[in-house]
């Protein structure tokens, strides 16, 4: 997980916390996001994201993400990316890296408690379907080459972006569409491929 391309993200995360008392709100964040997406985004998804944006920042702080702070100790934010108010929470010039490390730290704590089993150096080969529902995956152990199956009640593919499906991309070479394609081949729905 520490090799994800998210490590390159620098800007920050927009959230309607209204720390600067400049009139920010869920509706204002919603409108800025829709407008910034050239009115092509799904409005119900954007509205839901605007609603939970405050909680996302709080969750990241709880995971240990060191967001920039003002001298008084409150989280600092700035105007970034054409928004109308200061709502971008950031970790200096390395927001993506700090978010990734925070998420990985939270995952590590769950692994220590034996609540999560981690399979490093495994490549997903296929999705296992039972009565039309994803109930596991087939993987190849990249160390010894053995093929293994892993059953689950729910399958979540957290594969990251797939920008290398295009000819030109600044993303790492591992950011390809392979896992998405394998799931789509088994019947998973696929939408908005241009928004990677």
Report the location of each language-model feature:
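Glycine-rich loop(s) and the adjacent beta-strand/alpha-helix scaffold that form part
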Residues: 154-196
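Well-ordered beta-strand positions in beta-sheet-rich domains
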Residues: 147-151
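Short, well-ordered coil/turn residues that connect adjacent beta-strands
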Residues: 120, 153-154
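Conserved N-terminal/central alpha/beta ligand/cofactor-binding core
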Residues: 2-135, 139-141, 146, 164-165, ...
